[in-house]
């Protein structure tokens, strides 16, 4: 998957040369590093199609799916209109269905494929119209966590709790998340800047998994 250290490094090398917008899945949390966040990160997507990242996927001229696993977020959710142009970069052929039909597939060593692509796209600049759209969308990402929080007396808003947790962690710490409604809040709003340092159980969504992971 895209979250391996080698693949993450190659993705970051591309993003340092070409400011392409990136959307992470929950399992892909941490691929975008802290220094690349401002220019390239547009949030995470999964479960429900209502995030800024979903807006980006719908508007994209081309979706490059790197190590994408449909069990995380099925294409019928993010490509309901069946309008997305898709290229897959993975170690095995894509699971093609009505909603996921790649135009091209680069199958093999993902790190090597990305390294070979870098010289071909180096120097590419997004069209001016796309840049303006992304500026507006980035504001949506930022404002999404700034709305007025007024929890009932004696309760805590989930985002307030996440902010406290964020203050207690650094980029080297690994955070394990159990299954429940808090899982959605953490997946969308908890920031992680290293791959496989924010862990979720997708697919079967194993209850209680956070404890043995932590052990």
What do these predicted regions represent?
Residues 8-11, 138-214:
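Active-site diphosphate/adenylate-binding microenvironment
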Residues 5-8, 47-50, 104-111, 115, ...:
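Electropositive phosphate-/nucleotide-binding environments in soluble metabolic enzymes
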Residues 20-22, 43, 88, 108, ...:
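Short hydrophobic/aromatic-enriched beta-strand-loop microsegments
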